[in-house]
Curated annotation (Swiss-Prot):
Belongs to the PRA-PH family. The gene is hisE. Pfam families: PRA-PH. It comes from Listeria monocytogenes serovar 1/2a (strain ATCC BAA-679 / EGD-e). One of its GO terms (cellular component) is cytoplasm. This is Phosphoribosyl-ATP pyrophosphatase.
Amino acid sequence: MLNDLYEEIKLRKTQPREGSYTNYLFDKGLDKILKKVGEEATEVVIAAKNDNQELIAEVSDLAYHLLVLLAEKNIPLVAIQTELQKREGKLSTTRDRKEINDL
């Protein structure tokens, strides 16, 4: 599903469709896309404290906007899959991670 959506987003970038929200984001540029990613990430956090259906909807919105960001930056989805595969099975402990207050 994510691959299909990503391919559709890339298609919109090369073959714009009038009235397309995806094309609106591409036309507005990177700053607008980044703003939307930030907004959607915040909405995910808020939704997680509320209703599961709301959380599902907001995670879906965030995933879409992240895919738009990847397409804008010409980063193939396979690059994310490769990075996640590199991390698979690696042992990580809490002491290897910075405390949230230290960020």
